[in-house]
Regions:
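Hydrophobic alpha-helical segments
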Residues: 1-189
Length: 189
């Protein structure tokens, strides 16, 4: 894995430098999150990438049936499995400030420690296994997932989350996206 940006010629797009199509997407994103994340400024260089990301992300949030804390555990599991420090920091902030992830669970996730909450531990483990096995999780983990009270549709929504986070995680790898100040307190060392 490279520690330097592999995309060299494309630069972050600002509202001032955006084409009309890019501007509409970025403006919508700013209205949703209150600022222009560096990740979005990079993704919009290929407008279909940001558009697909925002659409899928919104559907996962609104339709997955996961509680907000569970959604964040899914996103953290994927981002960690993909080695994306930007998204791990960003979702750590959301987990801490907005989604109600218990502090001990967030600490365990960020530090690679066992998660004491069995439902969230099962969700985290299965999600990571889906990523690491390219969609072929261990049958025992799936059985534990059902036993924890999750349904088959939840597994499909994990696939959606993996798809969405792959767009963001891989874009961040290619650009070596600079962490936004908003997420600085959650930066991984």
């Amino acid at each position: 894995m490279s520690d330097s940006a592999l995309i060299q010629n494309l630069k972050p797009v600002t509202l001032a430098s955006a084409t009309p199509a890019q501007h509409d997407m970025l403006d919508k994103a700013v209205k949703q999150v209150g600022f222009l994340p560096n990740m979005y400024a990079n993704m919009v260089n290929a407008p279909a990438v940001l558009s697909t990301y925002l659409h899928g992300y919104g559907l996962f949030r609104s339709e997955s049936g996961f509680a907000p804390a569970e959604q964040e555990v899914v996103f953290l599991a994927i981002s960690q499995a993909n080695g994306c420090k930007y998204c791990t920091a960003a979702h750590s902030m959301v987990a801490d400030k907005m989604s109600g992830v218990p502090a001990d669970v967030l600490n365990s996730i960020r530090n690679g420690l066992p998660i004491e909450n069995s439902r969230l531990a099962t969700l985290f483990q299965l999600t990571q296994d889906v990523v690491k096995t390219h969609g072929k999780p261990c049958a025992n983990l799936v059985k534990a997932f059902w036993a924890a009270g999750f349904e088959e549709k939840h597994l499909l929504y994990i696939v959606l989350a993996v798809s969405v986070k792959t767009l963001s995680n891989y874009t961040n790898h290619l650009f070596q996206t600079q962490l936004d100040d908003v997420f600085a307190a959650y930066k991984l060392s």
